[in-house]
Amino acid sequence: MSAKDVKFGVDARDKMLRGVDILANAVKVTLGPKGRNVVLEKSFGAPRITKDGVTVAKEIELEDKFENMGAQMVREVASKSADAAGDGTTTATVLAQAIVREGAKSVAAGMNPMDLKRGIDLAVEAVVADLVRNSKKVTSNDEIAQVGTISANGDSEIGKFLANAMKRVGNEGVITVEEAKSLETELDVVEGMQFDRGYISPYFVTNADKMRVEMDDAYILINEKKLSSLNELLPLLEAVVQTGKPLVIVAEDVEGEALATLVVNRLRGGLKVAAVKAPGFGDRRKAMLQDIAILTGGQAISEDLGIKLENVTLAMLGKAKKVMIDKENTTIVNGAGKKADIEARVAQIKAQIEETTSDYDREKLQERLAKLAGGVAVIRVGGATEVEVKERKDRVDDAMHATRAAVEEGIVPGGGVALLRASEQLKRIKTANDDQKTGVEIVRKALSAPARQIAINAGEDGSVIVGKILEKEQYSYGFDSQSGEYGNLISKGIIDPTKVVRAAIQNAASVAALLITTEAMVAELPKKNAGGPAMPAGGGMGGMDF
């Protein structure tokens, strides 16, 4: 085990505070509509330009081990806020820095760190309660667009795209962000359920121009196993032919005699049919087939359930108004499933999302949820250069998470005003002793830091702006740093999702309180290089000097 360097008390806190300041100072320049860019060097390719706090925080690694520990703790604040609400990372970092700074001064003055922490916790509870009390539900499309615009640093085009996407796929739908190959930003929405499996044979194609299968009012057979023998399929095919409706077969695979017969019947025009492979693998495939069955009002044919293919009736098949199959994807629109069954399945998947600890499983469950509950929207972000596209994509990602959070928990005035107003409530908190009172006071001072920083980034005097905002009693009154005017921020469309502001203060206070109560730090000593003998000068072979 290698030797360790240990620092105590003031020494430890000073080093840690230096690390906190380096990271926070780099992150906080991005705050607000007039926040600056940060350029990140990449080991290959062009440098990356971003205004996303967590992206900047993740790039910072300091040489001094003790300073680095402080920086990494604050990086955790940004990461936790990004995970919880998807935005508000810079606000959280600014708050954490302010709490740690004031807290370190109080500890140096001889106050009890544990009582300071209790005071901080009391203050955060009061702030969260105030935010929830003043939160306003998001109802209109315009409000969603405003949230997106603010989070995308004042880019109204992004706000409109997101509002449109949310309107089309609903709150449960999935919105993904990709890089476009063109200059324009586009929105592509897939309504209904889509999975990434195409037709098994191109002979099933009905629309030769677009090379895809299009079927209206189709029956859907959902079979878990492979289909190779025709005999077990024959009774069902005859029943479907009698109805004159098309049939889509979803199975593990269709091959041999079964595939040949289906293709021949399709080409002769006797039976409108198409076959696709089932999506997913293993247990996930079973779950996805069950999703398709519930969406279409059919039954997944599985030997586990004791159902054999030859005994399947028309009543066991799913139905959909439209099915489209191309080379790579299958889309089922307007399945005939009962609303109550679909809602029950959605609730079940939501419960699984809450329980799972794996990020991969959570992502897959959310995809399944979207396919059942809404749809999938893809925003393709365009730009003139790769650097511009990447920077814009970061902002769209932030804005997307912010709009989701706004729909979930509502909105409060932006520009750091909600936290400023909450700071006024902290004067009423009763504490057990003076040290706890100082803990509350630390948070009260810190709550003005985001509004102050937004003003500083806009070239204004932060203290003057904060003073003017607090002079007015009106909750939504604040400073619009984009236009340089004061007024009602909610009516100006300057709003923050309550969830984002709440997560920012909770995460900032949690990590800052830990830093304040730190009394010792342990880090590995830097290894001394045991260098070998130096190379001879010139690097030539012996006896070849000129």
Curated annotation (Swiss-Prot):
Main location class: cytoplasm
Catalytic reaction equation(s): ATP + H2O + a folded polypeptide = ADP + phosphate + an unfolded polypeptide
GO molecular function term, any single one: isomerase activity
Gene Ontology BP annotations: protein refolding
Subcellular location: Cytoplasm
A single Gene Ontology CC term: cytoplasm
InterPro entries: Chaperonin_Cpn60_CS, Cpn60/GroEL, Cpn60/GroEL/TCP-1, GroEL-like_apical_dom_sf, GROEL-like_equatorial_sf, TCP-1-like_intermed_sf
Keyword set, alphabetical order: ATP-binding, Chaperone, Cytoplasm, Isomerase, Nucleotide-binding
Record-linked PROSITE patterns: CHAPERONINS_CPN60
Catalytic EC class: isomerase
SUPFAM superfamilies recorded: GroEL apical domain-like (SSF52029), GroEL equatorial domain-like (SSF48592), GroEL-intermediate domain like (SSF54849)
Family indicated by similarity: Belongs to the chaperonin (HSP60) family.
Complexes and interactors: Forms a cylinder of 14 subunits composed of two heptameric rings stacked back-to-back. Interacts with the co-chaperonin GroES.
Physiological role: Together with its co-chaperonin GroES, plays an essential role in assisting protein folding. The GroEL-GroES system forms a nano-cage that allows encapsulation of the non-native substrate proteins and provides a physical environment optimized to promote and accelerate protein folding.
Protein name from the UniProt record: Chaperonin GroEL 2
Species per Swiss-Prot/TrEMBL record: Nitrobacter hamburgensis (strain DSM 10229 / NCIMB 13809 / X14)
Lineage of the organism: Bacteria, Pseudomonadati, Pseudomonadota, Alphaproteobacteria, Hyphomicrobiales
Gene name per UniProt: groEL2
